Amino acid sequence: MSGWDEGAVFYSDQAQFPRGGPGGDPSADLTRHSALRKFKEFLRGFTGPTGDFPYRESLVHNRDHVTVAIEDLDAFDAELSDKIRKSPADYLPLFETAASEVLASLRSKVAGETGEMEEPATGDVQIFLSSKENCLSMRSIGADYMSKLVKIAGITIAASRVKAKATHVTLLCKNCRSVKTVPCRPGLGGAIVPRSCDHVPQPGEEPCPLDPWIAVPDKSKYVDLQTLKLQENPEDVPTGELPRNMLLSVDRHLVQTIVPGTRLTVIGIYSVYQASANQKGAVGVKQPYIRVVGLEQSRDANSNGPSNFTLDEEMEFKEFAQRPDAYVKICSMIGPSIYGHSDVKKAIACLLFGGSKKRLPDGVRLRGDIHVLLLGDPSTAKSQFLKFVEKTAPIAVYTSGKGSSAAGLTASVIRDGSSREFYLEGGAMVLADGGVVCIDEFDKMRPEDRVAIHEAMEQQTISIAKAGITTVLNSRTSVLAAANPIAGRYDDLKTAQDNIDLQTTILSRFDLIFIVKDVRMYDQDKRIASHIIKVHASGAAASSKNTDASEGENWLKRYIEYCRVTCKPRLSEKAAEMLQNKYVEIRQKMRQQAHETGRAAAIPITVRQLEAIIRLSESLAKMRLTSVATPEHVEEAFRLFNVSTVDAARSGINEHLNLSPDIANEIKQAEAQIKRRMGIGSHISERRLIDELNRMGMNESIVRRALLIMHQRDEVEYKRERHVIVRKA
């Protein structure tokens, strides 16, 4: 411990240069003073491609932080850049000291030239690093990267509250009352507190005991510190593997700049901190984390980080967009192994490209993402479409309705085991921000869980007010959902209301709703069987063509990404006028249908559906990289809307019309028997009620029709998955 007693100057130099400089490795050819001088020269004298001084100007304007590109440092001094990469913890403090001194000299120079008073110093300057190097995989970072600069990409799933981290701790001796200040290691490291006091006792004075120090919080120096949890991007996780997480530590001006769900590219120092002392062998086991020294958010919510397209790619994309069959070609790439369903494929293509987001003058945001619901019989390739979109969309998260809770879809509040504080952890809708959420078995979700995504689908935000945390998270995502009808298969003898067990509030949020039926037709069954047999028979041969298929998927993914980043179409005047007339016409037809049938459609046609057609038109224009949506795009959007949502709303509407007098009389008799059998508030099994009325000579179809009509009049209700009937007042 004698080296500790020689003073703060020795300790400071030792902490920053344990392997070099004076008293260190004699082979080191870059000392503390020469490194400081070179950093100053770099900040003062580095010139950009246009001859300006980017870092000098950045220091004058920002005053508290400056972002330095490692490539610029490479061009200025390769040795200095290499030291930053290999020993960032030693050289970054020097870099920040140099920045503070350069800023002070620049400000005094400006004050001398202008005659104005020099503004007071705002504190130390923080250095942010940036790099164009490729990111490392989270799985490849090991002990070889310890204390070196690393660059990784991922998605933020949790953010802690801001804490105060001590940079220098003031210690007070309990015996002699002497004061000592010791530095703290940056990041999650602590302070090294000496065990003995520096005070030399006078003759006859009692010496200070061991461990006499107590911390004085009021006299210590602090900075803001926040911890983040970074998870691998979903598209980077190998099949069957759990995503890896990495703890991040951000401080000072990087605090409170990131919310859960944000996609990040992080540059930081791979470090370790002490594991819990309660664990066995904790002294030798350290937990890894990254001390962030630079981060870059995704450039666009709809793109996976800053996308760099080559000139050849851009030329190829623009040439493809000019082809007259571009729309048909794109749709043929959607689910190539799935036979038929051409309109569903076109709708999914529109979902992948999306419409244009808009921000109104009053601050209201209008979503550009398209939601599609596939409702229909089993074995109609609904889940296959969802799996294809998960692989093709630039950002996608796949989940199943039965295994998804409200917190798992939106966000949850987790209590940290060590600090016992609460922090947010984003769910599927937050993690897929800027992409697509694929929800299978949508009808199997609990109603209270399904309600949780209402706000996420329309306002594209998720509001949290739990455990003292009140915040709003972004959820700018499209939803592709697949569901089965109530009875498992779609019953053509029932109305849409009786086949679709979803509330109007959730149905109105879907732009397109397709009822996918397994139609039993000889010719079609033969063609489908032939296609499936070919797919299975060519499975072995197709393995050699997998490369071509994957290249096609990658090309489509890149093209979708390029269109979403570069093209933001708007409606032309003619298209807007045509849209207005057609929407009024559809509303008139729906009013007429409601008047004829005496009840509203199961799937409403509201202003949301008008906005859906606008988004579809913009998406069709985006596929062709055109900046204006024309009447042709509106025409195709209306055709898709008619074959999906409008047909679903009209399905089964003639079922209860034109009943013969005999059947109408039998239905009335069945209603009377049901009311006589069931008192108000009583309940009975549907199967038992039908069997009892059968024994009285009534046909089962007549009894079911009577129950259906009574349910529509709200005289009875179904419970326990429609197995139990309850008589209402």
Swiss-Prot record:
It catalyses: ATP + H2O = ADP + phosphate + H(+). Residues 326-532 form the MCM domain. Keywords: ATP-binding, Cell cycle, DNA replication, DNA-binding, Helicase, Hydrolase, Nucleotide-binding, Nucleus. The keyword Ubl conjugation does not apply. Its EC number is 3.6.4.12. A motif (Arginine finger) lies at residues 508-511. SMART domains: MCM. It is an enzyme of class 3 (hydrolase). It is found in: Nucleus. It comes from the Eukaryota. Its main location: nucleus. GO terms for molecular function: ATP binding; ATP hydrolysis activity; DNA replication origin binding; helicase activity; single-stranded DNA binding. InterPro entries: MCM, MCM5, MCM5_C, MCM_CS, MCM_dom, MCM_lid, MCM_N, MCM_OB. The keyword Iron-sulfur does not apply. GO terms for cellular component: MCM complex; nucleus. ATP binds at G376, D377, P378, S379, T380, A381, K382, S383. Coiled coil: none annotated. GO terms for biological process: DNA replication initiation; double-strand break repair via break-induced replication. Belongs to the MCM family. Component of the minichromosome maintenance (MCM) complex, a heterotetramer composed of MCM2, MCM3, MCM4, MCM5, MCM6 and MCM7. PANTHER family: DNA REPLICATION LICENSING FACTOR MCM FAMILY MEMBER, DNA REPLICATION LICENSING FACTOR MCM5. Probable component of the MCM2-7 complex (MCM complex) that may function as a DNA helicase and which is essential to undergo a single round of replication initiation and elongation per cell cycle in eukaryotic cells. This is DNA replication licensing factor MCM5. It comes from Oryza sativa subsp. japonica. The lineage of its organism: Eukaryota, Viridiplantae, Streptophyta, Embryophyta, Tracheophyta.
